[in-house]
Amino acid sequence: MKKVFLALIVLVSLHTTQIRAQAEPDSLSTIQLEEVVVSATRAGKDTPLTYTNIGEAELKKNNSAQNIPVVLQTLPSLVAITEGGTGVGNTSLRIRGTDATRINVTLNGMPLNNPESQEVYWVNLPDLSSSLQSIQVQRGVGTSTNGSAAFGASMSLKTVGATSNPYGEASTSVGSYGTFSSSVAAGTGMLKNGLALDARYSKVLSDGYIRNGKVDHTNLFASLSHYSAKQIV
């Protein structure tokens, strides 16, 4: 009986020692890395490409609610075509003589080219330039990975991001041939829960230079962002 009792004491002692050994803290430290955002559709100063960057200040200076091709018409090797003669409605562009079917266009990294014709119909994106932070135009074969539309040139569009403080703004433009544009924009700024909401409403009207060139466009742009200590969504 004493031998059995002694064996039980030994087993309990071994089990207690094993639990204590498992409870010891791990000496290896765990490091949580912050989120890294990689943008691979734009060229840098060391990239062997011919490109032009247009910042937000220059976009605001040249913007009068016209479509992107007309806003960029002063760039080298770029020709803008506008059917109505006012810069709104049906517009297109050529870069180094290449038509729209070989010019790849991305918005925040997402391709805008039509999957069938490979063109971008700017008439469906009225007053987009008012919501952009920057544009990069790459002449010739560029950094895009979105298929055959990048053979002639590439255009990378980036929309405005959230601001720290709330804001509100309004603008109105009047031009020839009954052209009128008005837009209202507002943003909440960074809220306590990390959310930020930005929205813009635009209205573009024009009689056009030619017959049947009338334009009546409405555009609504909205962006919802969430910022945390380690991540941006």
Predicted regions span which residues?
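Hydrophobic, lipid-facing positions within transmembrane beta-strands of outer-membrane proteins
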Residues: 34, 91, 151-153, 166-168, ...
